[in-house]
Regions:
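Surface-exposed, charge/polar-rich loops and edge strands
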Residues: 1-221
């Protein structure tokens, strides 16, 4: 069972380190731990409120545990991972955007899949939908008449999101509290600001929240 380096003596039930919606194939070197908070009952309750789930796939590489050692984080080389975004997911994103709803990613792996599937050169599928991609963002891909999420079959990504990066698809994120100097910390600091993330972590420490894989989660809006 693939475990992060800070878990060296786990003797619990392997099923406790697996999401309820995981595929049976063994491709990933780590579990998408934000999803460990979800049970079938919780997902049913969320859907009863009107939310819809759509599944993406990303084969997490072992380098997900590798910390950013460079003094200049822009020099860090991101590992390559394989991912899949189906037509069903693309349609779900379009529907959510068209109806004015948020696309909420569960975990950083879902973020990397969805944002990797955004093609800045793709023709606009629906101006009303694509305009939502850049709402409140500086680059505004839709103003050029292009930019859309597209189907990705068996694709690869080295997407490295860090402060200053633009999110095109994801509006909000459910994620755990991450290890310092990790690419995951960079990713969440790109969706919020670094100061907001540091404030959230300080509050979590004060309230004695649990960190890392089996820890608590945060919602970034």
């Amino acid at each position: 069972m693939p475990l992060p380096p800070y878990i060296t003596d786990y003797e619990g039930d392997p099923e406790k380190y697996q999401t309820v919606y995981a595929m049976k194939e063994e491709h990933s070197a780590a579990a998408p731990t934000a999803g460990l908070h979800f049970t079938p009952e919780l997902m049913a309750a969320i859907e009863a409120k009107g939310a819809k789930f759509a599944a993406v796939e990303l084969e997490v590489g072992i380098d997900t545990f590798r910390l950013v050692e460079e003094d200049d984080p822009t020099q860090h080389v991101m590992h390559t991972e394989r991912y899949h975004v189906s037509q069903e997911v693309v349609d779900a994103v379009h529907k959510a955007k068209a109806e004015g709803h948020r696309v909420i990613a569960v975990g950083t792996t879902a973020v990397r899949s969805l944002e990797s599937a955004f093609d800045a050169e793709a023709p606009v599928s629906d101006p009303a939908v694509t305009a939502r991609y850049s709402e409140g963002r500086e680059d505004g891909a839709d103003t050029l008449g292009r930019g859309d999420i597209v189907v990705r079959e068996n694709a690869t990504t080295q997407l490295y999101l860090m402060p200053g990066s633009t999110y095109h698809v994801v509006d909000a994120l459910i994620t755990n509290f991450h290890v310092p100097r990790s690419t995951l910390m960079m990713l969440v600091s790109a969706l919020a600001t670094r100061d907001q993330i540091m404030d959230a972590y300080a509050a979590a420490i004060e309230e004695r929240y649990r960190f890392f894989s089996f820890g608590d989660a945060m919602l970034i809006l």
